Amino acid sequence: MEKFRVLDVSGDVGLEAYGATVTEAFVNAAAGMYSLITNLEAVQEKKTVTVTAESISLDGLLVSWLNELIFHFDTYGFIGKGITVDEFTPSLTLPPEGVGGEKSCRIKATVSGEEFDPGRHEGKLLIKAATYHRLKVEKKAARWEINVIFDI
């Protein structure tokens, strides 16, 4: 199954990611985003970081998740290659913290990769942020589909 594809968006860049589960679609969206930054074949899994994101909605969780990964790249130069989801809570039905708009959607993952090295890693796009513009996280037939636009 195709994991993701790049969307042609005027002035920005978009991504459509797929997965048999919503968790797999989130992982594939992150992999697709990293592939927009550099060629992942050159990235080695030398180091791991734990990345956590929360939101009150599944759409918001995706944006928070991708922006947290962008933060690690912008701040530490960390580019991920392997992603293992340790915890994924995609619903708003958690008691009691899920009541009253609390952040009840959550993802926690171990991301393996290394610091970006311009001598070894091809620089493609500088992604500023994942946006809510045309954002979509939905189940279609036998798979989950994600559409996300990145500010560049």
Model-derived features with residue positions:
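N-terminal intrinsically disordered, cationic/polar leader segments
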Residues: 2-90, 103-152
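Glycine-biased, low-complexity coil/linker segments
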Residues: 95-101
